[in-house]
Amino acid sequence: MKPYKEMHREQKSIPKGGLLMSDYITRERNLTLLTDYYEYTMVNGYFHAGIQEKIAVFDVFFRRVPENGGFAIYAGLQQIIELINGLSFTEEDIEYFRKKGCFSEKFFNFLRNFKFRCDVWSIKEGTPIFPNEPIITVRGPLEQVQMVETMLLVTFNFETLIATKASRLIRAAQGRAIVEFG
């Protein structure tokens, strides 16, 4: 099997239905576009409605603890910081959206001049957390708060799930050595 980079470079034609984000994102790129397409259509809608600069506050929380475990262990803060610090859009990214035919020039200018301006608060990583309590709070222009929603949720959910499982295994082992295979 060919390495991922070679397979990606061989793909020269655009599929009949258009571009897929998974075809577009390569390992050499930042992960800004690795999110729900919905987030970008919402931001474009905010520009259309003229409310993109309205200040918004989003809270990250979860509704229930997996397997009735009582609590979860918060993890993923470092990854979230790295993802937020890496948010940027190239002309190639903007061209991807332009080819979709449903985004405005205001949206393209926003991407071209993007600088993350939100405030982000988080509890300390490794803290036990409980359902329906804010874990991360993002406050800033609606256009930006919306864009990081999926990225925050995916990172928080996965990293917290792994940390919670590790905590449960260690507690269940009661001091004995453990090996976990997934």
Question: Which residues fall in each region the model found?
Answer:
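Ordered alpha/beta subdomains of enzyme catalytic regions
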Residues: 4, 8, 17-182
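Polybasic, lysine-rich low-complexity intrinsically disordered segments
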Residues: 2, 12-13
